[in-house]
């Protein structure tokens, strides 16, 4: 107090004020403080002080030739005095204004190319639609999300090499561009940025944004793809949300989405093959997504999803250490347990062998629509705090947690036998048996669980066995919370092992993932997925199997031909013929095979009866184990389009049609390729063009341009007309149907209409 009074007295004297404002600061400590180091200690003050001067900027001497000494108003733009301590000129801020108005202009052609992601963002926002604002409690959970739309998926190191190669090609230093995407991007960017005048450092910085995925751990309620995250601040607050539909999609979101679909399809297909792991690897290596190899995408893309992680594990890549059960990602946050086999009896007195986790553990459970915190002891649920979007989602989480707890009352709630099987018809393990059982119907489970009175805790309410909320009672140990549970934030990845049945384990032997955990949800991929493996032919149904099988034979005809004559058994056992067997009626498979093999043997024995088209046509039928019988067939049946369709042993049919004039084969109206040699066969019928999804309007109409091949038809828009070349070089006018529902009748009417159109 005394000191302050003393200071006040001093300040009241004018001399004190003069000393403080007029005299120079010459105390060494103060001078040191403000002058040591390169770091500016008071940037705001420095800026104000500098800008108050007449010439606060220094510039290269050349500026004197480029800028007049005075502007139109006669104000000085630069000073003749040199900058102290450097060979530069002192320049006024007015010079900047003059330069901006009158300085040289440069080409703007590179701006949209360099700042591509920014321009695209503006377009997305321009075409996006913002809906109404709703006020309600937002259950946000922190998730790791992608924050810059429109990026490639290079690692920081890969991107660095690309940037150096594009922006500073003459710099020294070894740059190894190995991955396909690196090479493509480098080539593309070098072309785009030829003669680019934008500062190289700026280009490098922007390129980095475009090449590397940037993720943040942000609270989100709703869409997590990058085009939603870029407007997060506009679409959700603490107590409000604004509806928004993005005005465009970006490739990185499409890649993530398509990768998940491809991985799910591949895992599902691998599960049912003889050696799941080998099949899975074969499919991953032969699949492309949006024209890029799936294995390259898997190496670069950080998406965490059960099927994607199984594929990564198979390739020997590290994955997240959390494990999956019932579609929820579990992460242990504290405690530990040992595992012990134990036999338990269900309510139906069926014996189950389960691996019991002994010990106290806490987990976070994160699903798409619900999250929870679970505390459990040995075969006992202590507490479950769950939050979710709706009653249904909350119920799903509760069922998974109850099954995971392995409590006796859950096992005793089983009614009836447990005999769920996977796609390969193998019994599921006991924990998944229980899960499937209660996911079908959890009434008994909830009724038998028990209820308890609850205390009034802020933000928490109880939930009754019928899944209605309550403030008085709740399922034992279970509470519903308004707050979500954050996703596990760490991006740490661990080394895992995978067995031939695609079960993924960490180094302690805990199962993290298995095919049972792969979602059955079907979706339509945004990017084209090309499965080259014959195992995936059936994904698009029987017709695709049929077309692909014949395409494969034609593509590999040279090799097939030699094997056919020298080592037929090996040819018959090729895996490419496996999918085809599902099209042949079970009852006749063996007979067909015996018949075709005998026919082929006769061809080999009798010179001059080698008939290429017939061999190609009948070869897939010879792959089944043959039955010895004297049966002769004039046609073989295949099950496509919901019914049996015939392939004629001699001659053409809608299923298999060889056009002698063009030497092309069409299978179900789809082009299956060209034969290089000329097989001698009778003329093919006009029935070839069973055009699904097209209406035949009549004879050729020159107004609609030159005749298209059957292949080119797929590019037509609905309702568009075109001339098309069918069968024996005849041309008819067709229109692509506006509705898909009428496709079925096309097959029956097409043949009649073609005849009429030609005659």
From Swiss-Prot:
Q: What cellular-component terms does GO give this entry?
A: host cell nucleus; virion component
Organism of provenance = Influenza A virus (strain A/Chicken/Scotland/1959 H5N1)
Q: What family is reported? A: Belongs to the influenza viruses PB2 family.
Query: What superkingdom does the record give?
Result: Viruses
User: Keywords assigned by UniProt?
Assistant: Cap snatching, Eukaryotic host gene expression shutoff by virus, Eukaryotic host transcription shutoff by virus, Host gene expression shutoff by virus, Host nucleus, Host-virus interaction, Inhibition of host RNA polymerase II by virus, mRNA capping, mRNA processing, Viral transcription, Virion
The protein in question is named: Polymerase basic protein 2
Q: Where is this motif: Nuclear localization signal?
A: 736-739
Annotated site residue numbers, Avian adaptation:
627
From the Swiss-Prot or TrEMBL record, state where the protein is found.
Answer: Virion; Host nucleus
Query: Which Gene Ontology MF annotations are present?
Result: RNA binding; RNA-directed RNA polymerase activity
Q: How does it assemble?
A: Influenza RNA polymerase is composed of three subunits: PB1, PB2 and PA. Interacts (via N-terminus) with PB1 (via C-terminus). Interacts with nucleoprotein NP (via N-terminus).
Q: What does this protein do?
A: Plays an essential role in transcription initiation and cap-stealing mechanism, in which cellular capped pre-mRNAs are used to generate primers for viral transcription. Recognizes and binds the 7-methylguanosine-containing cap of the target pre-RNA which is subsequently cleaved after 10-13 nucleotides by the viral protein PA. Plays a role in the initiation of the viral genome replication and modulates the activity of the ribonucleoprotein (RNP) complex.
Which GO biological-process labels does this protein carry? Answer: 7-methylguanosine mRNA capping; cap snatching; DNA-templated transcription; symbiont-mediated suppression of host gene expression; symbiont-mediated suppression of host mRNA transcription via inhibition of RNA polymerase II activity; viral RNA genome replication
